[in-house]
Amino acid sequence: MGAYLSLSRIMPYRTLEAACARINPMTAPQDAAAPIRDKLASYIDPYLGQTLAQANAVESVSVHRNGALVELKFGFPCADYGAELLPVLRTFLEPELGGVHLDLTLRSDITSHAVQRTLKPLAHVKNIVAVASGKGGVGKSTTAANLALAWAAQGARVGLLDADIYGPSQPQMMGLAGIKPQTTDGKHITPLRAHGVEVMSIGFLIDAEQPMVWRGPMVTQALTQLLGDTSWGQLDYLVVDMPPGTGDIQLTLAQRVPVSGAIIVTTPQDIALLDARKGLKMFEKVEVRVLGVVENMSIHICSECGHAEHIFGSGGGARMAEQYGVKLLGELPLDIRIREEADGGSPTVAADPGSARALAYRQMARRAAARLATLNKDYSSVFPKITVEAT
């Protein structure tokens, strides 16, 4: 009889199992991913402020011949987040990886979030986000445009409604000035599209030189009709560029438009902060969650010498956010190129996506979307409507 060599007589079973894995490393032992998965669950994402376990973000962890593969799911647009997150996770998981290569794949799962209790979400629009300011001149419209562009660039389906009826600027900023939207059925308006975003504005429907002398009720009626009669299609986010101020028009719009969250734009100076606080309180009054505060024109850096100067003061947005228990979503620079790009019809995120100022907008947008992702979801479309009839 031929000789038969039994490896089990030479080495213990566990050692044998490991040896076989090395000999034929097509797959690793089934539990090899467990230490990585357990450690990964405890990672606190800086945008969510939650562990990946709390966010239910870990879809799968597997270990193969070529290394480890981690698949994550986020409730916010994350098309360009992997490049930022991968080196951080490699360092965080270094002991568990044991020197093997780490691959990371991300996907977005953007859901609808709750709106005011007295309102129903807009059909086919998952989330409406209002961008507001207590006063004009703080860069609200520029921030709204770049917010919409940043979400679209990160993979979301985005619309932009210019509700600043007395000074509609989005047609110019989005490069759509002079273009009129069309209708296919005589009832609904097809929005214009620019830079990957669906855009609608009262500015498309009136002459650019025509002053708006409407009273409050006419304004709110026109805007709610514009919102409802536009064929937005399927959107993850609809950004509403609100009129500046905290008067009757703004309050009525906040009561009639089903908003998932609001963003307050201010500059660091005390006068702007006084009005921004009024805007924040207005949204609280109508039960709209404030996602956070954006401090615009935070710092100016001289293009000639590089000198940094806080022209409008410093830290005002952070102090306001801390005072009211909301997030500081970002500190945006005062840069002449931001103004030039907006005036030219191509806001910063589209005009110069690799610049530091565009990065500031993208990070602000991700913080806002991540904050929204942590809030209560809307389940009205999941559960059937129950009607109780008296007998």
Enumerate the predicted regions with their spans.
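Phosphate-binding/switch loop-helix module in NTP-utilizing enzymes
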Residues: 206-253
